[in-house]
Amino acid sequence: MNILILTPLYKISGRESLERNTEVIHHFAKYWVNEPDVNVQVVNTYLNPGRNLLFLLKKGELKKYFTPFDYEVDGVKVHLVEVQQIPFQNKFWKFQNKTIRKAIEDVAETFRPDVILAHFPVRYTGVIDRVCENIPKIAVMHYTDLWISQKHIHQVESIGSKFDVTFTRSKSLLEESKKLGIKNLSDFIVYSGVPYAESRRSADIAFSKDNPVKLLYVGKLIERKHLDYVIKAMGQLKREKNLMLTVVGEGPEKQRFEDLSKKYEIEGQVRFIGKLTREEVYRAMGDADIFIMPSVEETLGLVYLEAMMNGCLTVGTKGEGIDGIIEDGKNGFLVDPGSEKSVVETLQRILRLPNDEIQQISLAATETGKAFNEPDMAKRYLNRIRQLVREKGGNA
């Protein structure tokens, strides 16, 4: 079975100057190519901001922007074509569609796909019905697709009519997509997985009067992650419990968060340690008591699953991608979106739990994290693709 993946976000090799280098979709494809009857080809329609064109011009590398680039990573072949990042439905959108269509047709001519997967399908509604006729086409909705479809409602009709079926990336995204009325919407959720590894937790979590409770945040230091809510909550709870927060990551809001910890007079309890390797992050998770990231606009957030696999009492946000995987009070905790008060109340709730209940939740989190591992999630997704292709009479 030949699987053609369309996406504006994919792992990049050989073009280090390109910023949007993400592995989320590659975490599926790299397992699929190990199947004896499966070939995978990716068309990466990379969105390049205008400021990058000026950078390339200054370096004398503007020619690269206009030249498609082929590379291979972990056995997956990728055809990268750069298009300008412009507002949706801009008058230049049709010109971009021509570039995208040509890239798909050039690859499909020799690859001859049995099925097409479009991650971020709003980027392809202008071309998908004009390429590879009579081949099953699957749309996979991310939160970006939801936001654009809510603003440009005609996209709902396009996704529902130009693709054979639409999958989503989380339970909350599925529920929001149902509200839009997408005709071909499936209940199948394309869950991501974490690299399978043993938990780094060396001892059970147990709160005591003598030892501080160790909180951990891992992520970009940007506004929508709401690390400020955590720092403010610590400021309010500092007389109730000795809390220590380790912050892993970098970002434009770092100085603001540091200043906030000083404002609440807890700068000695908040450590900003920058970026870590995955192994170092796992060790930090194994040592932490509570992992907390009350972010919004989060399709899933693999870091939650990694924290759960390492036994952390994990705090996510209701209505976001992790909602439905975390069951509040059973294998983790959920706060209300955009609510500082909810963060405070949830931390208070956790800190007042008896140690036997804490250990039960930690164990349940570990089991959930291990269940959502990369190989199993990739196999689950591939089996659903095979089923659809067979239903359409194709080669699977």
What are these language model-derived features?
Residues 1-65, 393:
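N-terminal subdomain of nucleotide-sugar transferases
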Residues 4, 206-225, 231-234, 246:
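Conserved donor-binding/catalytic core segment of Leloir-type glycosyltransferases
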Residues 172, 193:
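Carbohydrate-associated surface elements
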Residues 258-276:
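Nucleotide-activated donor-binding/catalytic signature segment of Leloir-type glycosyltransferases, i.e.
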Residues 275-276, 283-288:
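Short alpha-helical donor nucleotide-sugar binding micro-motif in glycosyltransferases
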Residues 296:
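Aromatic "clamp/platform" in nucleotide-sugar-dependent glycosyltransferases that forms part
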Residues 313-316, 326:
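Short hydrophobic beta-strand element within catalytic cores of glycosyltransferases
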Residues 328-329, 333-340, 349-355:
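Conserved acidic donor-binding segment of nucleotide-sugar-dependent glycosyltransferases
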